[in-house]
Amino acid sequence: IVVHRSAGRYICGEVTAQVNALMGRRPNPRQPPPYLTQEGLWARPTALNNVETFANVPGIILEGAAPYAALGTEKNSGTKGFCISGHVNRPGVYELPFGVTLRTLIDEHAGGILDGRAFKAVFPGGASSSCLTAEHLDLPLDFHHVAQAGSMLGSAAFMVIAEGVCMVEVALRLARFFRHESCGKCIPCRDGTYQIVRL
């Protein structure tokens, strides 16, 4: 196993950008085809998975797929690494079965909202997902239910916002983040994020 430190940019999480970085190139994504399974690292077929996928493999091999598949929901079996940050007492990564509720994730695992404040919103799939509000606190967390609620689970990088925080300021900070992190390749992202910040 080789651990390769990325350049740290947001775009570096995209799989073709990761392959470019491993080859010493600028970590910009490319449009397939060819797909990585056909032509990836050093023009060879490449299987690229995240650490969460690899972490699940030993248990499945040792115990079989049935115990893992018995966890979770009907639509999404198994577990997920829920990464929670923002206005919580115990930010961190919690491996839990799909279907755990947002309320349970925040209150029982992340220790509740900082300073006893009320929950206002959460971005369940990181900065690029739509936020969920207090009406979603009992939502089962899996790809299906979060999509039905109008957002996306994605990498399950939960950004929790407490009551008293201005959501316009949050939107401006996210716009600045995306302006800074744009690879500059396409016009909507390169120029659009600049224009959004100017507004």
Report each predicted region and the residues it spans.
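Terminal amphipathic helices with adjacent charged low-complexity linkers/tails
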Residues: 1, 114-148
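Extended, hydrophobic alpha-helical segments in both membrane/secreted and soluble proteins
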Residues: 102-105, 118, 182, 196
